[in-house]
Structures are given as structure tokens and as C-alpha cells.
């Protein structure tokens, strides 16, 4: 399940950058990419919940990582909304980077992650 989760969030990030790029260009297909992106949000959340469910003893850090992951998805939506409205998205991009960094750090720190830290 770990590989499915990693694959889903990697595809989500790629689709996010594609959606932002298409939104900036005013491409008509941006809406379709955003709908596919939202589908991958759901896949990422479901695989994350399945990973949480598979852990025998869940520490508070796992719950914190889950909340940080939801924060990443929320920040993605805020960036896309700001881009669509033509507003400055600098603060939202900063929030997304911080949320992603926290989530990746916790994901790599916890026992189910890779042994980097």
C-alpha cells in the first residue's frame, strides 16, 4: 500500500503543476486537469487512510502527518483558486511549500517512511 500512496501523491503533484501551468495560460482543458487532480486527491487520501489503518499502534506523529497531508491538499486548492481569479498566489505558494516540507519530513521520519533521518 505504501507504493500506491507514494505513486498517488507523486501523480497529484505533477497534475497540480500541470493544472497551474494550464490555468496561467488560460487553456480550456485546465478544468479537466483539475477534475483529474481532485480524483487523485481522493486516491491519495484513501491510500493514506489505508496505511493508517494498517499500523498496529498509531502514534500522534502519524495523525500529525495525516493532518499535514490534508493541509497540502488544501493549499493546492488555494493556489489553484488564486490563479483562477488572477490574484497573487505568493502567500499560498509559500504555505504549500511549508506544508509539503512538513509532510515529507514526517513521512520520512516515521517508521513506514524511508530511512533518511
UniProtKB/Swiss-Prot annotation:
Membrane topology label: Multi-pass membrane protein
Xref: InterPro entries: UPF0344
Cellular component terms per the entry's GO annotation: plasma membrane
Regions that span the bilayer: 1-21, 39-59, 60-80, 97-117
Keywords: Cell membrane, Membrane, Transmembrane, Transmembrane helix
Compartment list: Cell membrane
Range of residues in the leader sequence: none
Pfam families in the cross-refs: DUF1516
Family per record: Belongs to the UPF0344 family.
NCBIfam families tied to this protein: PRK13673.1-3
Protein name according to UniProt: UPF0344 protein GK0697
Organism encoding this protein: Geobacillus kaustophilus (strain HTA426)
Taxonomic lineage of the native organism: Bacteria, Bacillati, Bacillota, Bacilli, Bacillales
Amino acid at each position: 500500500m505504501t507504493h500506491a500512496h507514494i505513486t498517488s501523491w507523486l501523480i497529484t503533484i505533477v497534475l497540480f503543476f500541470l493544472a497551474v501551468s494550464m490555468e496561467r495560460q488560460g487553456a480550456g482543458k485546465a478544468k479537466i486537469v483539475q477534475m483529474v487532480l481532485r480524483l487523485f486527491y481522493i486516491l491519495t487520501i484513501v491510500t493514506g487512510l489505508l496505511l493508517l489503518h494498517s499500523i498496529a499502534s498509531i502514534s500522534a506523529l502519524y495523525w500529525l502527518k495525516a493532518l499535514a497531508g490534508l493541509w497540502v491538499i488544501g493549499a493546492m486548492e488555494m493556489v489553484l483558486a488564486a490563479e483562477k481569479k488572477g490574484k497573487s498566489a505568493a502567500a499560498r505558494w509559500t504555505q504549500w511549500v511549508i506544508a509539503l516540507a512538513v509532510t515529507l519530513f514526517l513521512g520520512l521520519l516515521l517508521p513506514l517512511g524511508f530511512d533518511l533521518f
